[in-house]
A protein has these predicted regions:
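Macrodomain-like recognition of ADP-ribose-binding/processing modules
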Residues: 1-145
Length: 145
């Protein structure tokens, strides 16, 4: 593979949906830029694993502090920091050269086959909430996830 091939993204799918055209491409997320970077988050917004941990690491301590403050404020009212199916928008901090916003999306954990089927039924609501958030953001045309 030539060195320039590493940076190329492969188009897997393009579909029209009620929100516009959705293109699914593959490749290293760090070789892309866009208006929004979407991260799969846990309900504490802690950036503990996977892509979310990488994003927190690259965005810097400011992002960790902001998400920690969101958690503290929600605990004051006895609410989860970010409930399943919901999302939170933050600044990109150290990733601002590539993105305008980060959206932390809390979806249901469906990794184990013996989990309650009701969790899987939360996935459509998670995506609907994400697309509603994106529709409310006036400066978004490219989303990286």
């Amino acid at each position: 593979m030539a060195s320039h091939d590493v940076l190329m993204a492969e188009l897997y799918m393009a579909r029209t949906c009620k929100w516009g055209i959705l293109r699914v491409v593959g490749g290293d997320v760090w070789n892309h830029s866009g208006d929004v970077l979407i991260t799969p988050a846990n309900n504490r917004l802690s950036g503990r694993e996977g892509l979310d941990a990488q994003i927190h690491g690259k965005a810097g301590e400011e992002l960790t502090q902001v998400t920690r403050n969101i958690c503290l404020e929600m605990r004051k009212i006895n609410a989860p920091p970010c409930a399943v199916t919901h999302n939170v928008v933050t600044e990109p901090f150290a990733l601002s050269s590539n993105f305008k916003h980060i959206i932390h999306v809390v979806g249901p954990d469906c990794r184990r086959p013996n989990q309650d089927e009701a969790r899987r039924e939360l996935l459509p609501q998670t995506y609907d909430n994400l697309f509603e958030t994106l529709a409310e953001m006036k400066d978004v045309s490219t989303v990286i996830s």
